[in-house]
Each structure stands twice: as C-alpha cells, then as structure tokens.
Swiss-Prot record:
One of its GO terms (cellular component) is cytosol. SUPFAM superfamilies: Carbohydrate phosphatase. Its EC number is 3.1.3.11. Binds 2 magnesium ions per subunit. The gene is fbp. This is Fructose-1,6-bisphosphatase class 1. It is found in: Cytoplasm. Mg(2+) 2 binds at residues 96, 99, 232. It comes from the Bacteria. The keyword Cytoplasm applies. Pfam families: FBPase, FBPase_C. Belongs to the FBPase class 1 family.
Length: 290
C-alpha cells in the first residue's frame, strides 16, 4: 500500500494499523465466511447485546493483533467491560469488531470500526478513525487530516479517492423506531422525501455511513440513544467531519457537536446525526427548540 497521503504527528500509528489490517483481511474473511458465523452465542456483552460467533472470533483476532503494536498502550473492544492495558505505548484503540452483526445472516454489508485515541478515551483525544467494510469487495476508509478510501485487491489496499462531501446529498439513512421520533424529525424526513431523497437504511451503521460517503452526501440519523460513543459514534463522527460534513446531536433543542460530548462511562450511548451541511441545516431548523 502507498502511504503517501499520511502525514503529521499521528501518521506512523495509522500506517502501522493499516499494515496490520492489510495482513489480517484474509483471516477476517475466513471468520465471516464460516457457515455458523452468524449464529448467536449464549453470552451477553457489556452493552446487554447477544454477540454472534463472528463477533467474538473477530474480537479475539483483532485484540491480539492490536496489542502486538509497540506504540499501543490500551485496546478496548465493544464486546468487553473494560480496556486491556499494557505498560508502554502512547495510543489507545477503541473498536467495534463487527458492526452490523444483526444483519449479517441476511448477507448485508458489515464492518469493523476503529477509533485511535491519545492519552485517554475522550472525544477530544480522538486523533484518527478507520473502518473496513466487508461485502462483495472489501474497502478501507481512513480519516487523519483528510478522508481516504481504499479497495482491497491482490492482498493490498489500493487508493481510490479522497472523500469530500458535497453541500447537499440525495440519500437518507434513518434508523431507530419511527413511532418514537419527535414531531420535528418526522417533518424533516417528510420534507427530504418530498424533495426526492432516497431511503437507504440497512441496519448496519458502518454500511449506511459508507453509503453516504461514497455518494458524497446525505444523512445518517439515529435519534435514540443506542449507539456507543467510543466505539461507533466518535470514530464515524470524525470521518464525517474530516470529509467536510457535520456530526451532531441535540441537547434540549440545541444542536451540538458529537465530538464535544463528554464520556461518563465506557459504554455510554448517544443519539447521532451525520450529514452534509445542507441536511444538517434543514434538520436543525426542524429540531431547534424541541
């Protein structure tokens, strides 16, 4: 892989993680392709969810590999109660080993989300984000100074493009239970669809956000506090912001940046809106004051 795009203080650790992922893709594929990979276990993770077999197998594989990196001090999986910490190192990794696992049996797109933190697990300390999506092809998206997209081919990640969102998109990925949506959100969504926006929601956050990115705009929304800040929300928020979009939530009707949220507990959850500037502006108009 050509690493010419990665510059600055945190470039080296990102390159190390990508190199590790590049070498581990085939093993990850093997885990996902097993006939019983989508079968539910009898366990319960720290968030109260029941993981599938592929969740746990990928988690074990990734944890071992991340801990092998000299400059990684702490590794924290969504599947674990607390981080695994080493004596040395400068960076911390929080990751969701298999986002979208609930739709894997339907053969939908799933992926691994990775946030790279410095010093402590806080939004303000997030220095880079990555995700890998597994489908009929495998792609990697990385956010450092900008957002870069790669495709896996012949055992290597090959650069496709630098992703920059346009001011306005045409797709909406609206997750959550619609009967619980606020009146403002319902009106905003009705307005988008009246303007011929297309609904593109799969139940896999990483897949839906990836769709918004490769289409160069639109909106992903999940108004209920279900998504985990450290493992899903913050890493994908950074990617959207670096792609010139907006990542936000509403606090008593006031729009605020997701990456300015505090973290009171490791598995704390949040509502989440990731959007192009136009969609963010429209949503704020409808939800302001709610």
């Amino acid at each position: 892989m050509d690493y010419k795009h990665f510059k600055g203080k945190h470039a080296n650790i990102v390159i190390e993680i990508i190199s590790l992922l590049e070498k581990g893709v085939k093993k990850a594929q093997e885990i996902l392709e097993k006939p019983d990979a989508g079968s539910y276990t009898k366990l319960e993770n720290s968030s109260g969810d029941t993981p599938i077999k592929a969740d746990l197998a990928l988690d074990k594989f990734l944890e071992e590999n991340f801990l092998s990196l000299e400059n990684i001090k702490s590794v924290f999986s969504e599947e674990k109660e607390t981080p695994v910490t080493k004596e040395n190192g400068s960076y911390l990794i929080a990751y969701d080993p298999l986002d979208g696992s609930s739709v894997m049996e339907a053969n939908f797109l799933v992926g691994t989300i990775i946030g790279v933190y410095e010093k402590d697990y806080k939004a303000q300390n997030l220095v880079a984000s990555l995700y890998v999506v597994f489908g009929h092809k495998i792609e990697l998206v990385v956010a450092l100074e900008e957002v870069y997209r790669y495709a896996f081919y012949q055992n290597k990640f090959h650069f496709i493009e630098t992703i920059v969102l346009e001011n306005k998109g045409k797709i909406i990925a609206s997750g959550g239970n619609q009967k619980d949506f606020s009146l403002g959100l319902k009106k905003a969504l009705e307005g988008f669809f009246a303007e011929n926006y297309r609904l593109r929601y799969s139940g896999s956050m990483v897949a839906d956000v990836h769709h918004v990115l490769i289409k160069k705009g639109g909106m992903f929304s999940y108004p209920q506090k279900k998504l985990r800040k450290l493992f899903e929300v913050f890493p994908l928020a950074l990617i959207i912001e670096k792609a010139k979009g907006e990542a936000f939530y509403f606090d008593k009707g006031v729009k605020k940046r997701l990456l300015e949220q505090s973290v009171e507990s490791y598995h704390e959850k949040s509502e989440c809106y990731l959007a192009s500037p136009h969609e963010a502006q429209i949503l704020e108009k409808y939800l302001k004051g709610e």
